[in-house]
Amino acid sequence: QRILLSLAKSAKDLGCELFVLDDGWFGNRNNDKAGLGDYTVNKKKLPAGLEGLADRVRSMGMEFGLWFEPESVNTDSDLYRLHPDWALTDKHSPVLGRNQLLLDLTRPEVRDYIVENISAIIDRAGISYVKWDMNRHSIALGAKAHDYILGLYDVLRRIFDPRPNV
């Protein structure tokens, strides 16, 4: 957190208006093989939580943005251990790429989970910008591709329509 605040001060001194915290702020996300999908703040990394960091950044006169990759999950994550059935599969097995799986956005419960969790974080920490990452091609989607994209549009609408300034 100390390093992030030092970077934020440097960003402010350079005239930046927005400070965006990238990947690694949550769960057991210490490498690209673990924690993706577990969007609870890692208090060892951010003792004051996202709210505390965001407040400090705003006190410097900048807005605060945050990274998410809500469509993906690592097999080494609490979310996957709790809901392995939420991962997209190719016939019978999940399709692993870049150490991650895609969540099945054709399923209403998956979309609800993403919307509820991301919305709560945005609202609690006063996030003004979301960096929505996605580093997978859609080959694993197959026949579900159209319904997956409709599910993604539903998630985006439900998160951002009530928050037009994000």
Task: Describe every region a protein language model picked out.
Residues 42-60, 81-166:
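Active-site neighborhood of glycoside hydrolase catalytic domains
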